[in-house]
Amino acid sequence: SARAFASNFDDLNLKKAIHYAKVRNVKAHLTLNTLLKDEELQDAISLAQKAYEYGIDAIIVQDLGLATFLHEHFPDLPLHASTQMTIHRLEGVKKLEKLGFSRAVLSRELSLEEIEHICKNTKMEIEVFVHGALCISYSGQCLFSSSIGARSGNRGKCAQSCRMSYTLLEKDVETNKEKTLDTGYLLSPRDLCGLEYLERLIQAGVTCFKIEGRMKTPEYVATVTRIYRKYIDNILAGHPKEIAPKDQEDLLQVFNRGGFSTGHLNSEANQDLVFPQKPSNMGLYLGNVSNFNANKGLISLPLNEPLAIGDTISFEKEESKYMVSELMIQNKNVPKANSKDRVTIGRMKGNIRYWR
């Protein structure tokens, strides 16, 4: 989790946010999903009490001590078990029900069949992740960041160690020589996209879908929510529809790491789950550069996607990003270009390497 780096709510803004949601008929949930130290418990209780008084609809928790206290003192306050609790089987869900929880956010590591089995055998509300970043380890249980970066993922300070570049070596036990097998972002998972499984999950009895959006832009939240809401409503109305290419493209454009993964929903093989070429947003594939004039700062290429002045582009194997400020077709400046147009992009000054 990277929650410690987010712009979190203070008391006043929390109250305003809850009111903002209420007047728009939207539920507001507060996340207190971390394991607490003794000296932190009172602050957590105080925050939960304020949220309760402000009219919060539910609190998402991981710490069983905090959950027990909240259930005893605020029995009408719905408690949701965080995915950080690693609820991965039916017995765990049944235990949570006895402890006073009303909903369980299941581990992201479960398959469709496992989710269906749990839903079929409990009356408890079940929530599952359908979109966003995945952990290479069990969510909330990874000590990788703590071990090599001294930053606890569980405490909200994940160093994103799985997003770093690594070299896989094979050592010959007899000669003691090492051979490089692979190099890249070998532990970096693609983002989850469960759009194609919504109907099956709804039929299974899943109560709520969760979108991972920590540290994402408002555009990301709006785009992903809009698209998932559209297909959920279609299914609930009895008119499920095929995923439109434009919707898939919008999801890719707003954020993707080398395309999407179906994660553990269909027990995807690790080779498909991980994208070793780049750990950050890839955007859409624009095309292959056919000509690069470093002195004039010009690049030419046939477009695979539309492009316009103000769009941001990047290059494979490069970290820098560039805003398009000059766009030409046949030496004439244009505000935008369509897919399959051959364009020249100007003013491309900077540390650009031309890979052949």
Regions inferred by a protein language model and the residue ranges of each:
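Surface-exposed amphipathic alpha-helical tracts and adjacent flexible/coil segments at the periphery
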Residues: 1-3, 15-52, 61-65, 73, ...
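Basic, amphipathic alpha-helical recognition segments used for DNA target recognition
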Residues: 69
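Beta/alpha (TIM)-barrel catalytic core signal, keyed to glycine-rich beta->alpha loops juxtaposed to Asp/Glu
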Residues: 86
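Conserved nucleotide-cofactor-binding alpha/beta core module
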Residues: 90-91
